[in-house]
Every structure is written in C-alpha cells, then in structure tokens.
Amino acid sequence: MNFENNSTIAAIATAYGVGSIAIVRISGPKSLSIAQKLSKKKDIQPRVAHLVTLYDDQSEPIDQAILIYFQAPKSFTGEDVVEFQCHGGVVVANMILQELLKAGARLANPGEFSKRAFFNGKIDLSEAEAIAKMIEAKSEDAAKILAKQIKGELKNYIENLREKLIRILAYVEVNIDYAEEDLPKDLQEQIEQQLNDIQEELQKIVASSKRRAGLIEGFKVAIIGKPNTGKSSLLNALLDYERAIVSDIAGTTRDTIEESVRIGTHLVRFVDTAGIREAHDTIEKIGIERSIQAIEESDIVIAMFDASKPLDAEDKKILELIESYKDQKEFIVVANKVDKGKHLDLSDFDALYMSVKKEITPLTQKLQKLLDSFANTEEIMLVTSRQIEAVTYALENINQARTPLQMGELEIFAFHINRVIESIGSITRPMQSSELLDKMFGEFCLGK
C-alpha cells in the first residue's frame, strides 16, 4: 500500500508535557537512513536497544537516547519503524522531531501510524478502534475489555460468525442452481434454527454492549426528584464540596449540572437535574425537559423523595416515571430527610431511608454494587457506535430474510444474507470509502 508516494512519517508518541522519558517515532521507507543520519551510527541492528547521541543538521548534539529499529514487516505499522526514547519534557522531543522532518520525514496525521498498520494487514478495524479507546480508558474493566479486543477476540468471533453465515448461503445457492427443486424441508428448518441462534446471540451482544457502554465512556447517573428533595445536597455530598446551590426555594436548580466522581473503580458522571414539577416559568420548563432527557440518556437513575412529607402529586409524577422506565433503566430510590420525620412508605421500591447531609455510605455502596454488575469483562463487547450500528443492520436483514426463506424465494433470501455477511464483516474490514476511514483514523491522537 502506497501512502503519499511512500512517505516517511514522524510524531511524538508520548503525551505533551513534563516526564522522565519521551518517545519520538518514525515509520516508512526512509526510517533507517534518517536514524543513521541523526545518530551518526551506520550499524543499527533490528530489535536491539542502541544507546546513541542524536545530532542536529549542524552536527551539534541534541540528546543521548535509546534507538530501537523495527524492520519491516515485523513492526506495528508493517513498515520500517524507528523509536527514539529521549529525555522527557517538551523541548528535547520537539528538537528531535524537527530534525527528523529536516531529514526527509513529514509530520504524521492523527492516527496515521494505526491507519498504516490497518492497510498493511497488521491490525483490523476493531483492533484499531480498541487501541483508540484504550488510550481514553476510564476504568480497569474498560482496559481489560479493550485489551482482549486488541488481541483479536472480537475479530475471531466475527470470523466464526461469518463462516456460519457463508455456510448457510452456500446451502441455499446450491438449490438456486437447481431452481426446479424446492429447498428440502429439513434443510429449511435447520437454516431457520441457525438464523434464530445467530439472531439471539447478536441481540444479546447489542443489549449487553449498550448496557456496559459506561465501562468505556464512564457511567451516567441522573439525580431526579421534585424541588427540595435534596438532589443538590446529594451531589455536593458526593463531590465533597458545594457545587450545586442548596436553597429552600423551589426551582433553584433550573438546569442540569454535571460532575464526575469515582465510585470504586468506576468513573461516574452525576447529573443534578431541575426539579420535576408543574412549571409556570419558561426557563424552568426547559430545565424539566432536560431532566427527562437526562433520564433517557443515563445508565442509572437516583430518584429522590422527601421522607418527612406525605407523597403529593409531584412525587407521584416521579413514581410514574419510574414505572415508565423501569424496564429500560436501573433505579435507586432514596427517601431523604428522615431526620425530620418519616411520613411515606416506599418499601415497594426498595428505598433507602437516609439523610444525605449526614450519611451517604448506604447509597454509594448500593450504587457501587449496581455498577459492578455491569462489569462483565468476559462477554464479547461492541465498543463503538459504528460496531453496534453494523450488528443492528445485520439483525434487520436477518428479519427480512425470514419470509423469503419460508416462501421459497431463495434469491431474495440470499440477497439479505449477503447483506448480513457484509455488515458483520464491516466491523473488522469495512468495504466503505476511504473518506470514512480517513474520518475514523483522524479521531486518533498524534503518534498512534
């Protein structure tokens, strides 16, 4: 694969800032000759750590560094790659990078090293996406899931699934060639059962992946309730500082407030919503609409009630919301302000009776237990919306293939199964345009 006339690319691979070591990386046909020029060392052996002095174009020393040469195709990109491990900080790494550019390399685009690895067959697209997500991993569980995907777990699963589908297609196409004969009944039933199994498996993977998406991106927890139930007090207690305004005036929080906290090993974004009540103020009404949106976008919802007062119409609206979303969302019901009295019974909702201004440990413990239940690192997981969309499209075509199979319209059935195969295959090696790939790899950081 040619990349801009076999160009050699260069970038700083480590994060910008102060550190003990920085890594500058080059990849392409000129990598070795450029390394020889900067180090004034001709005998550079592959996969050997060479201690060298690097020089600028005026033969002035820049730094003493470790130079490692990875000869093609045994490198991350599949090309000749050289890494310079120099002293950390911004200045030295930038000086080395500038000399590499003077010597014939060009500055790499974001994600270009991974893009070259993809086009050279060193990684597939699911592995490339996992690399990008690993850099931004928010938890240990995320790192474990992504490490498996980088190792090829999803790729292997997809290949096995494609083989099953291709086998089904082969059975059908043999019968298409003999159009005068119907598909044998036992074979049709066998194919239907195989499709049922594949469909059920894919549906579980999509549902599980959506449910566990917070492991990768961080979980979102919405705090809802009518005004003055203690939502802002809870957020402040979780943060251990006063982020939200606490007031006895209803409607003080008129917009959603988001803050991130670690609960156990999980990164959690708490959303303190506007109180859900009959709104007479346009601004407050917008806040309430955003509260409902926050519920729909959240993984977990904490519903707050004032235990010191009987349920009123506004509380009942919250209970109606819980009933509406209980099959889609996880809820934790909190009866707050028990220090002022206990005048409502929420035992049907397994409520926590507490005063969030005094003690939130029971709530954080229940929340952590719930978050831990998401953390199944053993199951296959789709880690990007692109992967989920590909499987969803495949499921649509499996459904569309059923009637043609039952009606004996085998060519139409084969058309839909081909769509399924293409869609599933696109997870690892898409057939789309280079423009899409440019966009995807462009979201990587420099040096990857």
Swiss-Prot record:
Compartments (UniProt record): Cytoplasm
GO molecular function, one term: GTP binding
SUPFAM superfamilies given in the database record: P-loop containing nucleoside triphosphate hydrolases
Keywords, comma-separated and alphabetical: Cytoplasm, GTP-binding, Hydrolase, Magnesium, Metal-binding, Nucleotide-binding, Potassium, tRNA processing
Gene Ontology terms: biological process: tRNA methylation; tRNA wobble uridine modification
Gene Ontology CC terms, in alphabetical order: cytosol
Binding site residues for GTP: 228-233, 247-253, 272-275
Enzyme class: hydrolase
Pfam families: MMR_HSR1 (PF01926), MnmE_helical (PF12631), TrmE_N (PF10396)
Binding site for K(+): 228, 247, 249, 252
EC number: 3.6.-.-
Lineage: superkingdom: Bacteria
Record note on cofactor: Binds 1 potassium ion per subunit.
InterPro entries documented for this protein: G_TrmE (IPR031168), GTP-bd (IPR006073), GTP-bd_TrmE_N (IPR018948), GTPase_MnmE (IPR004520), MnmE_dom2 (IPR027368), MnmE_helical (IPR025867), P-loop_NTPase (IPR027417), Small_GTP-bd (IPR005225)
Predominant location: cytoplasm
UniProt cross-references to PANTHER family, sorted A to Z: TRNA MODIFICATION GTPASE GTPBP3 (PTHR42714), TRNA MODIFICATION GTPASE GTPBP3, MITOCHONDRIAL (PTHR42714:SF2)
Family (UniProt): Belongs to the TRAFAC class TrmE-Era-EngA-EngB-Septin-like GTPase superfamily. TrmE GTPase family.
Primary role: Exhibits a very high intrinsic GTPase hydrolysis rate. Involved in the addition of a carboxymethylaminomethyl (cmnm) group at the wobble position (U34) of certain tRNAs, forming tRNA-cmnm(5)s(2)U34.
Protein name per the record: tRNA modification GTPase MnmE
